[in-house]
Amino acid sequence: MRILAIGAHPDDIEIACSGTLAKCVQRGDTVIVCHVSSGNLGHVIIPPDELRVIRANEAKKAGAMAGIEVVWGGFDDLEIYDNNREARDKLVDVIRYANPDLIITHDPDDYMPDHTAVAKLVFDASFTATLPNYKCTSRRLAKDDTPAKLTPIYYMDTLAGVNFNPTMYVDVSDTIDLKLQMLECHESQVVWMRDHDGIDFPDMVKTCSRYRGYQCGAEYAEGFRQCQVYLKGTTKRLLP
């Protein structure tokens, strides 16, 4: 299988579903992660232009740990809007490049505007990318306008699981250590979350995985729910 995980910022995927993606790589899947935004505003002290470079390096390091390809959506923080063609076409390009069998992204009811905008853009772009006669106006990755497949969408957990009720779980007990190592590659964000949100970032993520584990009889787990609309459903179990 080819799996595309699309997160708003570098580290969103590591927080919500990197344990699952690591298991996908281990079973032989090709996994591509797209960070839609550069993450350039995620620090109290480091200026945006400098932070953009730091976070790109952190994301590449994290992806390499699990054998995951990392690509970028071409936005900066809080500049992701879900109501214009340019934004949608940037994700059409990513989806046509990846040609996935499954897309994982943010829940539409997540906590901040970049996350909810990405959820809407992925929903729109995943259909648009399948149209043979649709000409993408923002092609950086895909070689041409070859359409992508119709693809199920799974929504990953929200931060701290707020307002999210999983309909499926993945046991990540054997990849939780790798998940935390990938997360800790994002050193700038460990500091940011402590200073801005007042939390111990790795501890929060581990605790949330333990909580989902309690819900499904595993030591650690990640939760997902499927996008239930026409052409997005499937009877198959696609996750490990």
Question: Where is each model-derived feature located?
Answer:
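Active-site rim/loop-helix segments in enzyme catalytic domains that contact anionic ligands
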Residues: 1-98, 225, 236-237
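Metal-dependent de-N-acetylase/amidase catalytic core
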Residues: 1-4, 82-240
